[in-house]
Swiss-Prot record:
Signal peptide: none annotated. It comes from the Bacteria. One of its GO terms (molecular function) is protein serine/threonine kinase activity. The keyword Kinase applies. PANTHER family: PYRUVATE, PHOSPHATE DIKINASE REGULATORY PROTEIN 1, CHLOROPLASTIC. Bifunctional serine/threonine kinase and phosphorylase involved in the regulation of the phosphoenolpyruvate synthase (PEPS) by catalyzing its phosphorylation/dephosphorylation. It comes from Bordetella pertussis (strain Tohama I / ATCC BAA-589 / NCTC 13251). The keyword Nucleotide-binding applies. This is Putative phosphoenolpyruvate synthase regulatory protein. Keywords: Kinase, Nucleotide-binding, Serine/threonine-protein kinase, Transferase. Belongs to the pyruvate, phosphate/water dikinase regulatory protein family. PSRP subfamily. ADP binds at residues 157-164.
Amino acid sequence: MTSTPIERAVYIVSDSTGITAETFSHSVLSQFDEVNFKPVRLPFIDTLDKAREVVARINRNALEAGVPPIVFSTLVNPEILALVRQSNGVFLDLFGTFVSHIEQALGLKSSHSIGRSHMAANSEKYRNRIDAINFSLAHDDGQFVNQLDQADVILLGVSRCGKTPTSLYLAMQYAVKAANFPLTPDDFERGALPKTIAPYRGKLFGLSIQPERLAEVRNERRPNSHYARLEQCRYEVAEAERMMRREGISWLSTTTKSIEEIATTVLQEVGLERV
């Protein structure tokens, strides 16, 4: 008999976008499979009035649930931080935990600037990310083959193995110009890489997937089709992996990996630097 998962509310509180706190909370909470976490995102808590509303909400949840919710905070304003810290939650101050130690090590005080890590509207890094996103969108699924020489990496694999989300994640997070190109039954019959990408062998990295998982994904898109049959998926995956081995192309299986793990592996294998 399967026991009912424990439920716990999680509040992600920030005076900016909350992206940092949310990313950190996902990484930490994923270690506890037996708990069904209920995340509540509360960005732009930048006034005392908003902070009081947050405290009331957290306290109400603690009273109704009978257990204190978990609170991840990247609040910077000292007054707002002090107010929310008094709530009846398990309060985790992500910036304070690390910033004070760094201040001590450097002998300097931090700027306490809200949203500093995301204030990039006019920066070169921001423009590089936008350029990378536009490039990846234009070069998705082999639809635009010009300027492949400008790609930092070209992802290969059968349809629906995770090429598109990985390309976009690399672009958005690391400003990597990632193109992706499908391997199709026509390529397997020819027994050669598509001519379009053959000149860029040094940029190629392959993605694969377990046939059973591929069949599930394809059935969501085109139910009961030849494209989604398990036998067809087994054939395509086997042929794609055979081709990548023969051509000396590094590759990995995406089946049990998160998008973050896939992207990190690609960066390491291709030798790209994080931005």
